[in-house]
Amino acid sequence: MEERQVHVVEIRAPVADVWAEITKLRQIQKPMYGTVLDTDFKPGSRMIYRSEDGKRVFILGEIREFVPPKRFVHTFRFTNFAESPTLVEWDLQEVGGVTRVTVTHSKFVDQKKTADSVRTSWVGILKNIKSVVETGNVPFKTRLVLRLMSAFMYMAPKGTLRANVPELKETR
């Protein structure tokens, strides 16, 4: 199995603006498929990407490194896959008013479902971040998808229900 995936996008905006979008807390992150990020960004702390109402958790991780506005490293596990966590590294570099965002997703050992899923989803996420930072919104097609996802949230896998995530049972 491949050991790492690298995805890059260049965004015509200062690094501070891009960083603010990537690390936005407790608000809907349209680029991240309408999820809400909860964490305190301290190394060792838990992080989750959840539904707006908090009833579903899609991604669970642990903060490994947080160096604003340049680097953000965390583990990553889809709650609906019975797979071990992988590692995500966000690296941002600004040159001449353009910010290069590099996402390196690694530590795939037996995580075939995760690897297959993120191979295409990172491309869409980075494209959406670029659109939000440069234009103020995600592309029209993404807005439609987000509406559909919201309307059909009740059909999301049962493994995403907060009550079904073993690591979160004590924080119900």
Where are the model-predicted features located?
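Hydrophobic ligand-binding cavity/cleft-lining segments
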Residues: M1-D38, N164-R172
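Hydrophobic pocket/interface hotspot
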Residues: V18-I22, I28, M47-Y49, I63, ...
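Generic structural detector for well-ordered beta-strands
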Residues: V8-R12, I48-R50, E62, D91
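Residues that act as N-cap/strand-start positions at coil-to-secondary-structure junctions
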Residues: E3, Y33, P43, V57, ...
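Terminal "cap-and-tail" regions of soluble proteins that handle hydrophobic small molecules
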Residues: V95-R172
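Hydrophobic-ligand binding "helix-grip"
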Residues: L37-D38, D53-Q111
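Short coil-to-beta transition motif at edge beta-strands of beta-rich domains
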Residues: F41-M47
